[in-house]
């Protein structure tokens, strides 16, 4: 079940670890900010600002960096919202709430559009990733019920 690559000469383990994907759920009032992807995979699909964590940064710093790069948004980082293991692709997705301080955006080259959506206006069928959809469903359900909790689950 847990086969690892072990060097028979030096008796060391070659670790293959999952990648961390860091994301924000930028919100303003009853709306969330979505970015329309300008790169593959899933070009022209909508997503939350996201990307791979880089060496030397914390998960929240990485999520903040991605939000600045992809959306050009002004925001205040908040708390961890969802943690999802996606073993099929060797990733862990960490989503943070981020309160927007402006409704003006300056998307970077990876984003063709960035705009605010209310729950009923989200292009649910055009979302890039299942993890984004699951997070948004939790976000709006929690908002309706006045909850502020952290969710953790696996995506198969």
Role assignments for model-derived ranges:
Residues 1-24:
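Acidic, metal-coordinating catalytic segment for phosphate/diphosphate chemistry
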Residues 3, 30-31, 103:
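Beta-strand-connecting loop/turn residues
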Residues 3, 20-22, 42-44, 73-76, ...:
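A generic structural signal for short beta-strands and their flanking turns/coil linkers
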Residues 12, 30-31, 73, 120:
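Well-ordered beta-strand scaffold positions
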Residues 19, 27, 41, 88-91, ...:
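A generic fold-level signal
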Residues 26-27, 34, 98, 116:
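Conserved hydrophobic "DFG−1" position in protein kinase catalytic cores
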Residues 27-69:
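Conserved Nudix-box catalytic region and its N-terminal flanking loop in Nudix hydrolases
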Residues 53-138, 142, 147, 155-156:
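Unchanged
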